[in-house]
């Protein structure tokens, strides 16, 4: 894989406890050529010094120090500095599996979006070596739509992005939207998917995703972020479809519908929601959705929310109680 050069972008902010483990795993990567761009986003602990230390030891590590501006700004800084043909976003409290092998790397010549597997582990859990991970790349004979309907990815760390589609030119380059705390990674991914033509799947576990106590994504704070930010993300995606003349294909319809459902589910579990304002937002987004040529959602819950958010909340709470979830 001498011709496969990837830029690994690592946003860093106050992760001194985990950072060395992350960078050590990257330094052991031998399957292809790489550079690692470490973006220190104004860390107040020793994370910035650790980044500099690794850059002095290995020229493949490059460091950018910037004032704290958030993870999206850090990723964008990494994108601007990237020299590789491919892009891989790695979180600084996670690690990668450097021991995988790819038996038929030539298939990558035609791919422009590569999905692979990840494993989740709890903080403090010892990672055991993986067996039978030969990394055989499977480029199926499915159409792009069929492939993307079959294989979904909610973690952008499980993806290689072809830089060609990310950085077409200065005016058309993709970037992470600023000002939102959830969904910006999916927004970036879906926009990229509207451009790519040859998605592929790598049959290997390349990424280790750490589950940290206190970083849960289903607490009330996270649900409130969903309530506030997902409407913005959905709105930007619909505007992107309009500006880029994106066809309303099933794979994209399915993904945006999931965002709608996540928004409604989160809102139903948050206390003190302004139901009137939420209903107005949902109706406006669904109207914009229809104007872009997407079929009106078949989901009975989505239809109910369009008629009455309050009725949706009541039905959803009854359903959750029956399931013993809430």
Give the label of every model feature segment.
Residues 204-213, 218-248, 262-290:
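Catalytic core of nucleotide-sugar-dependent glycosyltransferases
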Residues 87:
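Short aromatic/hydrophobic "clamp" motif used to bind/position activated sugar donors
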Residues 24-33:
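Short, acidic, metal-binding catalytic loop of nucleotide-sugar glycosyltransferases
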Residues 66-82:
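Glycine-rich, basic loop-to-helix element that forms the pyrophosphate-binding segment
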Residues 71, 92-200, 207-225:
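Donor-binding/catalytic cores of nucleotide-activated saccharide
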Residues 25, 40-50, 91:
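A conserved acidic beta->alpha catalytic loop
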Residues 10, 33-42, 62-67, 91-92:
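Short beta-strand/loop segment that forms part of the nucleotide-sugar
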Residues 268-326:
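Membrane-interface aromatic/basic loop that binds lipid-linked glycans or pyrophosphate carriers
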């Amino acid at each position: 894989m001498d011709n496969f050069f990837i830029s690994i972008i690592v946003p860093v902010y106050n992760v001194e406890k985990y950072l060395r483990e992350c960078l050590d795993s990257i330094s052991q990567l031998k399957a292809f050529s790489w550079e690692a761009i470490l973006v220190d986003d104004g860390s107040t602990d020793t994370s910035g010094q650790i980044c500099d230390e690794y850059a002095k030891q290995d020229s493949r590590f490059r460091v950018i120090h910037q004032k704290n501006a958030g993870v999206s700004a850090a990723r964008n800084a990494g994108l601007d500095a990237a020299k590789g043909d491919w892009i891989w976003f790695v979180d600084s409290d996670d690690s990668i599996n450097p021991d995988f092998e790819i038996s038929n790397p030539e298939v990558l010549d035609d791919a422009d979006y590569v999905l692979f597997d990840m494993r989740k582990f709890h903080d403090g859990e010892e990672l055991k070596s993986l067996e039978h991970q030969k990394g055989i790349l499977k480029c199926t004979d499915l159409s792009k739509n069929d492939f993307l309907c079959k294989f979904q990815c909610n973690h952008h760390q499980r993806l290689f992005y072809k830089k060609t589609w990310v950085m077409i030119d200065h005016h058309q380059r993709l970037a992470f939207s600023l000002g939102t705390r959830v969904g910006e990674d999916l927004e970036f991914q879906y926009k990229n998917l509207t451009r790519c033509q040859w998605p592929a799947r790598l049959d290997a576990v390349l990424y280790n995703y750490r589950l940290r106590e206190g970083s849960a994504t289903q607490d009330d704070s996270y649900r409130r972020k969903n309530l506030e930010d997902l409407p913005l993300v959905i709105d930007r995606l619909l505007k992107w479809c309009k500006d880029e003349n994106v066809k309303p294909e099933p794979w994209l319809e399915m993904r945006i519908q999931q965002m709608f459902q996540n928004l409604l589910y989160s809102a139903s579990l948050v206390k003190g929601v302004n139901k009137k304002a939420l209903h107005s937002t949902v109706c406006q987004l669904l109207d914009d959705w229809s104007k872009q040529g997407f079929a009106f959602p078949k989901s009975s819950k989505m239809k109910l929310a369009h008629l009455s958010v309050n009725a949706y909340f009541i039905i959803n709470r009854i359903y959750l109680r029956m399931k013993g979830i809430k």
